[in-house]
Amino acid sequence: MKLASLNQGRDGVLIVVSRDLTRAVKVPQIAATLQAALDDWAIKRPHLEATYQRLNDGLEPDAFYFDQADCHSPLPRAFHWADGSAYVNHVELVRKARGAEMPESFWHDPLMYQGGADSFIPPHSPILMADEAWGIDLEAELAVITDDVPMGASAAEATGHIQLLMLVN
């Protein structure tokens, strides 16, 4: 199933996108935004999956041409953003570019930080910076969207809370 958010409103408008990325359909009868769908995922997911199947079968009368340039980030605002630097070769290159050695511990204890999640930039929008000399770090990342994970959950228990995977950056 492929989901996206149109760049309309503060939290976007949820759409279901066809497998071949050519068609999409708005789903306000299911959820207005991806966050609204996630808030009630156990109920919303089957309806979204059924819509995805109908869209791919050519049975959605309100389907429209899908243009990625019309999209916002899937979750324009998220409740939490924890970034784990698991791609150690990238961390090493970024640190090298600024003349810093990478600590040996990064090879077995990945760096994790809590980043800003209140306003992600749409994929085709310019990245505005006060000074371009600061440099812009752009890399491909994977986002793991979970439901409510209890504190102290083991890795195996946390796996059961994964709801979506997304490409980021």
Each predicted region: which residue ranges?
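Active-site microenvironments in enzyme catalytic cores
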Residues: 1-8, 19, 35-37, 42-169
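Short N-terminal binding/cap micro-motifs at the start of the first secondary-structure element
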Residues: 11-16
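A short, surface-exposed interaction/processing loop segment used at functional sites
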Residues: 22-36
